[in-house]
Amino acid sequence: MRNNAITRFFSEYSALGHVLEGRDLLALARATVLQSPAILRTRKLTSIDASMSRNMNVRFGKARMAMPLADIDRILAARNDNPTFGNVREMYARNCYLEHLRLQTPLDAVLDLGANRGMFSLLALLALGAKTVVGVEPVEIYGPVFRLLLEANGCEVSRAPRYTKFISCPSVERQNPDQTVSIETIMREQGIDRFSLVKMDIEGHEQAVFSEPAWLAHVDNLTMELHPEFVDDLHPISKALEQYGFKWMSFDQAGHQVNIQSAMFLYASRTSSLVA
């Protein structure tokens, strides 16, 4: 297990070398030395993430994004949230949402379901050139964090509308319109006919969203984190994707292609954008 922790760290360390600037790589090296006992003891990188709570710039492809991590973590301190550098590792260094998609950019409209701090929304705006990114995130405290990210990167708020609701299907939305919103309503209210990309990380709510899958007819590409701990049977997701003409692949946390019920990430496309 100790060897697994070491292997995982050095794999992520290598990936971080492609996104961090020199001074932040040096800070990472220092944090590695200081936190190595905690890493080996816990087999987690949380201590590194906490040590790297500093304002920095991150590269993703040709894009350079301002990441005020220290400011974000101060906002989220009352919620006892995970240090935001962990999101940098997973989303930008590991490229967990786009690793198996080769998208033709710039994109038009992007839908970020489970938008959290808004770091994928920012990536879509700056690195993928999205015209509009609609976010859905029910936790209110992430709203100020996202506005901070937009301001730090000179992005207009009008390009990134956000719903502070749970995403669900139309039938659930009709029963509880104050707390839930459907993709169909988002498209109608935002005047969007089609999404170039949908990113989804909604902690088990995918079961309801895919129970009424007509929205897939208006989507080109999909990337999602799966939650088998919350959803007993994920196969309706793959069936719905195939019904609407998508090719898809699913992978475990280590990056091995596996069946959907054992997977953590799923990538789907009907624009021939999938890569193994």
At which residue positions do the language-model features occur?
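Phosphate/nucleotide-binding beta-alpha loop and adjacent structural elements of enzyme active sites
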Residues: M1-A276
